[in-house]
Amino acid sequence: MNFFVYLLKAYPMGNQMRHLFASWVILLVPVLGFSQSTASTAVKPAAGDVAAQAYHEPYRPAFHFSPKEKWMNDPNGMVRYDGVYHLFFQYYPNDIVWGPMHWGHATSKDLVHWQQQPIALYPDNLGYIFSGSAVLDTTNTSGLGQPGNPPLVAIFTHHDPEGEKRHTNDYQNQSLAYSLDKGATWTKYSGNPVLKNPGITDFRDPNVSWFAKGKKWIMTLATKDRISFYSSPDLKSWTKESEFGEGIGAHGGVWECPDLFSFTRKEGDKEKTYWILLVSNNPGGPNGGSGTQYFIGDWDGHTFKTQDKTTRWIDYGPDDYAGVLWNNAGRRRIFLGWMSNWDYATTVPTSTWRNAMTVPRNVFLQDANGKVYLASKPSPEVLSLARRKLRLRHVDVDSSADLSNQLKDDGGKYILDIKGAADQSVAFVFYNAAGERMVFGYNNVKQEYYIDRSASGRTDFHPGFGGIYTAPRISKDPVLNLEFVLDRSSLEVFADGGLTVMTGVFFSQQPLTKLKVNTTDRWTIKELDYAAMASIW
C-alpha cells in the first residue's frame, strides 16, 4: 500500500498543495533512512534501549506476531524452506508510521514462535520495496542458484518516489532478489526491474507460483482495480496472459495483494480442482475501509474465469487485510493477514510498535447451501500454546450468565469453542472490571453476526473505530458453532466451522479477563471448550 497516495486520495487538495506535499515527501527521504545500496545490510540498532519493555507494553499481543518495534503492514514473501517458515513484511524501521518501505523478516519452525531477523531488503535507487512474494526455485529456472543449492527468489514491487513526485504513471515496477543461504541474506538481481510498468498507476504486489501443468511461473499482479496474469519460464522474462475483474467483485477502491492457488478434491468418482483468487481492496471492505475478497473459479494457465458473481469475503471483520498464503507448505494452505485497517492503522494508540498479524489459519473448501465456500480456522499449531484447558457441558443461560469464575483470570488470552442452538439471538461479552467490553453477537432475526467495540476502551483515535460491524451467517445449521481467539488487543471469531470469520482489534486499558453470555430467552450452551494461552515472547 502506498500510504502517501492513500493520503492524497483521502484528503483532496489543490495542485499547488499536492506539489508541496510531494516535495515534502521527497525531501524527507534521506532523513527517514532511504538507502541507495542494492544489497542487504545488517539491521541498524534503534536509538534508546527498548529491550526491557519489548513485547510487554500496553496492548502488545501475547501470541500474534508483531515487530519488536516500529511500523509493520502487509505480510510478504511467505515461504517455507528446509523446515523453516519465513515471514517477510512491509516494514519501516525508523518510526511507528508508514515510511519508505523495507522488507522486515521473521522466521519460525512452528508458525507460532517467531524470531525477528535482520532486515531482508532495503530501499535503493529504484525505489521503496513494496509488497511481493517469494518462491523456492527448485530446478534453478532463474539461473540464480548453484549446483545443489536452489535459490529462494523474492519478487517485489519497486516504488519510485521520484516518479510519483513527477506524477508519471509508471513508477511501480517488478523486481527480483535472491538468497543462496536459506533466506538469511539477499542480493538484488542486477537486471532489475524484470517487469516494467506499461503505464498503469497502480501496478504492484506480484504473487508468483509454479504452474506445473504448464511448466511455467505465473505472476498474479494487482493493476488498479483489476488482476493481470503474467507467465515466465525463468522468473526474469514475463509475458502477459490475461486480465480479470471487470464488472465483478467489489470495486470500492484499488485492488492489492492478490494470491492464486488451488484445491483438488474427490466429488463422486472424479477429482475436481477449484482455483481460488484472493484480492484485497482498499477502501471498499465489507464494513468500510480495507478488506479481502475471494473468487472461486477455473484457471487454465492463461485465464481465470468464474461463474459466481457474488462478492465473498475471507473475513468480514474490520481488521484482516492483505492476507496471502505460504508458498512451499506442502498440501496445506496456510493464510496470514495484516490485523489492521487503513482507516486507522497509523493512529492506533500503541507506542513502540504498530500493528500485528492474524494467527496463521488453515484455509479449505466448505460446502453450504449447495455452494462451495472458502473457509478458515486457526492452524493446529496455535493450540500448542494452550497451558490450561477446561470443558463444560450443558450450561443453562437464563437471559444472562457470567462464566468468569469458571474460566478464571488468564490475562485475557484464550481460545474458546462454544456450541448452542441457533434458534435465538445471543451475545458474548468479553469485559473487564472497568466496564470495557468487546461484544460478539448473533442476531437470529437478521441471520447475521456482529462485533460491537463501541465500549472496548480507546476509540478516540478515529471517528469510525468504535462501531458495530456485521457479517452474514452463511450456514443454515440449527447449531451455532463458534470459535473465539482472544488476545490482549484482538478478537478473531470463526463461526460455523470457519464459513463466517470476523477479526477486530481493540484497545482496552486492562485485559478483558471476564466473560458473560446474554440471550433473549433461556439458552443452553451445549459444549464449551476453553484453552488458556501462553505468550510466545
Protein language model features and the residues they cover:
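Intrinsically disordered, low-complexity segments enriched in small/polar residues
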Residues: P12, V31, A46, P75, ...
